[in-house]
């Protein structure tokens, strides 16, 4: 299977490079590495916590605000949110207005629909305690990025304005109680009634770049130090920083370089990008959220123009 092939490729690379330890990146958290220290949460724990049904039950049992989650839509009132039980980035999430639009299949869960601003907290844990680095605004399904539905398309750090309730403190308590290590994230919806926990991510998050830019902290170094029982102090915010993922409106081939000082995750010329897949990320910094958002939108328009011209040639 695909998982076995990934394990093989990692083993081959480890054999060639011979590192002191391995840190697994997003999407590889449950990969198996033999004969070396792996500086991540244990794979079994990550797999368990990545299960959205397990998360909802755990949050409820431990007294944290949660979204009601069921293995079928029968016990919930419509409309319901339908999403994969395992998965990230808002892929496969949709709202079913009634039972005729449910399109139920194996591996899905149903949740009550909750409205609010999407936010996250970036946290470092040492297995017993935890320290929040920053609260972030999450960009979800923003049309100017080309993202559709509930697709994650970036963040702005810090979250402005901060909610009255201390989501950073709540995120620290969740990560500490779960006994998580290294870099973890807690996603929230900020509703009129207060914050609700959406999910816990036991991995490096998409906010890494904006957290580093806005605070000056080295998240990877903080991750490594946590395995020695060292937690950073909560950093001060120095500026606002944003990252947006730009999605392809149609399938096309990259004809020219998209490498600029403000782009990241850049595909090589000649790469084929399929419709609705990410093209690249854009970065911006400024003195406040409004400034950062305006710069991100300007850069997004420029990338759209370049890739539109590119795909028409």
Model regions: which residues?
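Short acidic-glycine loop/turn motifs at beta-strand connectors
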Residues: 97, 125-130, 190-193, 228, ...
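Peripheral (often C-terminal) accessory segments that flank ATP-dependent C-N-forming ligase machineries
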Residues: 222-313
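A conserved helix-loop-beta module that forms one wall/lid of the active-site cleft
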Residues: 36-99
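ATP-dependent carboxylate/phosphate-activation module, predominantly the ATP-grasp catalytic core
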Residues: 115-179, 201-227, 235-236
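Conserved ATP-binding module of the ATP-grasp superfamily
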Residues: 57, 65-67, 79-82, 91-120, ...
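Short amphipathic alpha-helix with an adjacent loop that forms part of the alpha/beta core around
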Residues: 6-17, 73-77, 100-103
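ATP-binding N-terminal substructure of ATP-dependent carboxylate-amine bond-forming enzymes
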Residues: 1-44, 287-312
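A short glycine-rich, hydrophobically flanked beta-strand micro-motif that places a catalytic Asp/Glu
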Residues: 181-192, 235, 313
